[in-house]
Structures are given as C-alpha cells and as structure tokens.
Regions:
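Conserved hydrophobic "DFG−1" position in protein kinase catalytic cores
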Residues: 11-12, 19, 88, 105
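Short secondary-structure junctions
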Residues: 58-65
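Conserved S-adenosyl-L-methionine
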Residues: 67-71
Length: 129
C-alpha cells in the first residue's frame, strides 16, 4: 500500500477555521469531503515549506505556518497517510479556490457539522476538545 507524508493548514482568523471541500475524486470515500487545506511533502521540502507551497498552489493564499497542532495516521482502502496539521495565520484577506469546490469559515462548535475526510477527523477532535 502506498504511503504519503502530508501536511494540513489549520488557518484561524477571527476565531474561525478555514475548511475546504473536495470535489469528485477518483476514490468515492474522499469525494466531496471537507478537509483542512494542504498536501504532500515533496522531496527536499520541510513540512512547513510544503504547506506554504500547497496553499499558494491550491488557493493563491499566503500564510505564516506556526506550531504543529496534531499528527494523525490513517489507512484508507487504497493508500495510507501520516498528516501533520499546523496552526497557520493568513497573510491576505483573499484567496481563490483552484482545487476545491467550496469553503467555509467555521467556529469550533460548527466543525463537527461537516462531513470530514476520515484522516481529518482526528484534527477536528483535537480542536474541539
């Protein structure tokens, strides 16, 4: 089974968290699920560099990457990931969704209402407790 090391941005602004929704993917179990934005770490990158790059690629959104919030390991049916989430501060008030179909700014209490990708559930639980 293929394994990926990935990073996720827990972007917080005015006590709300940025959540993005995937479109249709090649796997039904990740299609239209909500997630924290991020992606794979490329060879030669630090996790923080990867996260800043991914948010620029996916959203044209400059961020400052802060401390790690949580690391989760998850096995999907076709691949597994180790994902580290970092608290991030936006450096702009605007962004553009290049890869996702929707976004929401959610207060902590609202996070549990979304249909999350399985790997992101541990991060949501960490933020809500």
């Amino acid at each position: 089974m293929k394994h990926y090391d990935v990073v996720a941005a827990v972007v917080c602004k005015d006590d709300r968290y940025l959540c993005v929704q995937r479109g249709r993917t090649k796997f039904e179990y990740t299609s239209f699920k909500w997630e924290f934005p991020g992606g794979k770490i490329e060879p030669g990158e630090t996790p923080r560099q990867a996260l800043a790059r991914e948010l620029m690629e996916e959203m044209d959104y400059p961020i400052t990457v802060g401390d790690a919030v949580e690391t989760v390991r998850h096995e999907y049916p076709n691949f597994s990931i180790t994902m580290t989430a970092y608290l991030c501060t936006p450096q702009s008030d605007t962004f553009h969704l290049n890869e996702h179909v929707a976004y929401r700014w959610c207060e902590k209490e609202e996070l549990a209402e979304l249909d999350w990708a399985a790997a992101d559930v541990g991060i949501v639980e960490k933020l809500c407790c």
